[in-house]
């Protein structure tokens, strides 16, 4: 992704999506090239894919920018560099699959006679990108897919969205039936993920909470830490899937408290794969994944 190299954790769920997608396609004997920022690493299950890395100026996450902000269209932008590299490889390929939420790869669909397929990773976070999705989708409706209906609803001009959910390599997760560990929260530590609500709940019921994920906003994390006694929050950092599932599987429950329209909610499925029940806000993808009272519990959004 343009905000961080693969294996850094900065790309959030997109990194897991890419790993699962590439691994699945390789198992079906497809030839795969992956273009990513320099220092990227692929997971072991994707090792037979060809990895091409490029350098360029990174950008901030769209959810942390003003809705009316303009795209960085400089020649040195990492998005443009990745797109340029991908286009140089097309003579041996059938299609480009774009996982970035950015203007250039989407607009390029109108400019070249080669299929560029877009798996949109976020809801409507940018007017400029929403407008280009609308324009390109009207010409190439089958070139776009979304993770959930809740996410696709952010784009009302798309009347019949293609919903693909997400894929998971379940062999990477160990199902643990009995556990009496602490509560868990997993995700990028940033305001839109709503960690403060999960910590509040844990504190109110006298429980400790393990927090896994890259700290994207240091001030936000520090403010949450300041509000609660030392030891109530156990910061675990970002871990690869094999290490995450070991610790997550020992927890009693995962609390999922997104403040935005979560496109899917990979961590919800990851917790389920470990045998950990999930309590989540009924918002975005988690509201579709969880069957209330059967595979987890849903509560009114923001009702901590």
Give residue ranges: language-model regions.
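Catalytic cores of nucleotide-sugar-dependent glycosyltransferases that transfer UDP/GDP/TDP-activated
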Residues: 1-304
């Amino acid at each position: 992704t343009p905000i961080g190299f693969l294996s850094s954790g900065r790309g959030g769920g997109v990194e897991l999506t890419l790993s699962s997608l590439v691994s699945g396609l390789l198992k079906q004997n497809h030839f795969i090239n992956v273009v990513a920022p320099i220092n990227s690493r692929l997971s072991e299950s994707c090792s037979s894919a060809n990895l091409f890395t490029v350098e360029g100026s990174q950008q901030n996450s769209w959810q942390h920018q003003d809705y009316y902000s303009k795209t960085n269209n400089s020649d040195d932008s990492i998005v443009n560099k990745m797109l340029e590299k991908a286009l140089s490889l097309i003579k041996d390929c059938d299609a480009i699959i774009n996982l970035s939420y950015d203007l250039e790869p989407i607009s390029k669909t109108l400019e070249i006679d080669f299929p560029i397929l877009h798996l949109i990773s976020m809801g409507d976070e940018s007017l400029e990108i929403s407008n280009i999705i609308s324009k390109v989708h009207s010409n190439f409706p089958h070139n776009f897919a979304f993770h959930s209906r809740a996410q696709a609803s952010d784009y009302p001009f798309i009347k019949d969205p293609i919903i693909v959910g997400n894929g998971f390599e379940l062999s990477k997760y160990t199902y643990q039936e009995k556990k009496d560990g602490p509560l868990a929260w997993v995700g990028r530590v940033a305001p839109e993920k709503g960690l403060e609500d999960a910590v509040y709940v844990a504190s109110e019921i006298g429980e400790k909470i393990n927090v896994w994920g890259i700290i994207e906003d240091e001030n936000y994390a520090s403010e949450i830490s300041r509000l609660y006694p030392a030891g109530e929050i156990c910061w675990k950092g970002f871990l690869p899937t094999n290490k995450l599932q070991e610790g997550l599987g020992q927890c009693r429950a995962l609390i999922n408290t997104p403040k935005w329209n979560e496109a899917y909610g990979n961590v919800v499925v990851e917790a389920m794969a470990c045998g950990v029940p999930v309590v989540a806000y009924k918002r975005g993808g988690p509201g579709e994944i969880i069957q209330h009272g059967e595979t987890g519990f849903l509560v009114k959004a923001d009702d901590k």
